[in-house]
Amino acid sequence: MGGIRRRTLIVLGAGPAQLGTYLEASELGLVSIGCDSDPRAFCIRLGVPTHHHDVSAMNPVAIAAVARRYDAVGIIAAGTDGPVRIAAEVAFELGLPHPLDPATAARATDKLAQRKAFDAAGVPQPAWSADGSRPCDGAVVVKPVAAQGQRGITRVEPRGSLDAALALARAASRDGAALVEELIEGPEVTVNAFVADGEFYSLMVADRECADAFGVATAHITPSAHPVEAAIEAARLATRALGIEHGPAYVQIVLGADGPRVMEVAARLGGGHDGELCAQATGVRLSRVAVLSAIGEQTPAPQATRASGGVVRFLLAPPGRLERIEGLEEARALPGVQLAHVYREPGDLLLRVARGADRAGFVLTTGATRDDALLAAERARETIRFVVR
């Protein structure tokens, strides 16, 4: 690893989803350059990037200029979908190593392309349509083809009109297109994996708890409380269908009455501190492996060394103007608490939770069992208080 020291990595984004990437880059001795147009982004305020450039993570021309300026050895997009394609395109343009080629990155960030690829490969997935029609008789989900987070997603009941939902989804999509998908009822799991030379390695399966707001995760809990073998196989088929040969993969799956259904694949680290959770619960430092793959370093096939309970519990604050945060240091000192951070500062306006960006912070806990980790997370959550007016 000595050859890595003092080399520069471009990281697209500086929000909570990139925290683990910056921490691992620092431990590897890399200079990290955070590209984010928000000077108050969470990781910037935390001081974890070596340097910050006020450029959008979706601006390939500006990112290429920053990479040239620092003679970067790699570019990584972690935790959010949009920059995945940008990172691959800029790396290709500059001749830098990268786990994804531009065509694969484009497929992995386009929900319509994913659906078509899954159909062609026989991957279990919901019924869907791209022409604005209903693909089934039951409830459906209308979503943008090219967006991230929970932007533009609406549930429509069997007798409901699709018109308003389609308009919302198309407005939120980078390409103005929308999908209508069968709503699959059942628990949701996420498969966190790494692909090395075409081989799929499932590292952690977590249960994904959601808030009332459609699709907003409130917790990731590992190990899963459900049988996961079929879900892991579906995740493997889905990543292969997209042509992912190397790099991290994050697969969202609903365990329906007729078996697992793949909701989507992200060719990146998960955005809910999944890399940090994987390291604590399994011993695999997934964020580190992803950083190494982004700079062209060969890494051995990752293997879990333990299987303890682990939880990422997101903190949901009441709406209002934040006056102060209480109990954070006390929570950090509680048994089982490995990480605890808040994303907000006094003076921030806190909104009702409608998308992932509205969450106020997180705690990461571990325990000998899943229940132990859940208990530690609940104690930590109750200790941290957001005082608003």
Residue ranges and their predicted role:
Residues 1-104, 300, 317, 343-358, ...:
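ATP-binding N-terminal substructure of ATP-dependent carboxylate-amine bond-forming enzymes
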Residues 154, 182, 279, 360-367:
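Short, well-ordered beta-strand elements within core beta-sheets of diverse protein domains
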